[in-house]
């Protein structure tokens, strides 16, 4: 599937932030609760929420509310999904920063 220049620009702009790019790579594998992302990225909850809001506004992620908790996963039905996959699969699985963040994955505090 192809996308127009404006859509590609929005896609690349959203992914241009290192934190959002890594989040999206993680979402290819599974969903995450906000509390897990806070621990993994060692960022404040408002900062994580701001990144997630940008990803959600772009249509790249789904938000699933379960009680007071919010879980995020990749939106496989977004028009840019094929492009997202192509970009995200280019990230080296042995990337030092990606693996550092993955190693901090914890059991969700919300479970």
UniProtKB/Swiss-Prot annotation:
Keyword match Repressor: yes
Sequence positions that bind arsenite: 33, 35, 39
A Pfam family matched in the record: HTH_5
Keywords: Cytoplasm, DNA-binding, Metal-binding, Metal-thiolate cluster, Repressor, Transcription, Transcription regulation
Gene3D superfamilies with a match to the protein in the record: Winged helix-like DNA-binding domain superfamily/Winged helix DNA-binding domain (1.10.10.10)
Compartments where located: Cytoplasm
First-listed, main subcellular location of the protein, grouped into a coarse class: cytoplasm
A single Gene Ontology CC term: cytoplasm
GO molecular function: DNA binding; DNA-binding transcription factor activity; metal ion binding
HTH arsR-type domain: residues covered: 1-105
Binding region for DNA: 34-57
A Gene Ontology BP annotation from the UniProt entry: regulation of DNA-templated transcription
Residues spanning the signal sequence: none
More details: Can also bind zinc in vitro, but it does not impair DNA binding.
Protein function: Metal-responsive transcriptional regulator that represses transcription of the aseR-ydfA operon by binding specifically to its promoter. Binding of arsenite or antimonite causes the repressor to dissociate from the DNA.
Name of protein: HTH-type transcriptional repressor AseR
Species for this entry: Bacillus subtilis (strain 168)
Taxonomic lineage from the root: Bacteria, Bacillati, Bacillota, Bacilli, Bacillales
This protein's encoding gene: aseR
């Amino acid at each position: 599937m192809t996308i127009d220049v404006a859509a590609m620009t929005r896609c690349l702009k959203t992914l241009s932030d290192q934190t959002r790019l890594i989040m999206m790579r993680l979402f290819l594998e599974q969903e995450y609760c906000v509390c897990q992302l806070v621990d993994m990225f060692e960022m404040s909850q408002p900062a994580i929420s701001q990144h997630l809001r940008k990803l959600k506004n772009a249509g790249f992620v789904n938000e699933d509310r379960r009680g007071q908790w919010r879980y995020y996963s990749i939106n496989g039905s977004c028009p840019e999904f094929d492009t997202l996959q192509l970009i995200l699969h280019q990230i080296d699985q042995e990337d030092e920063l990606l693996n550092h963040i993955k190693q901090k994955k914890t059991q969700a505090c919300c479970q």
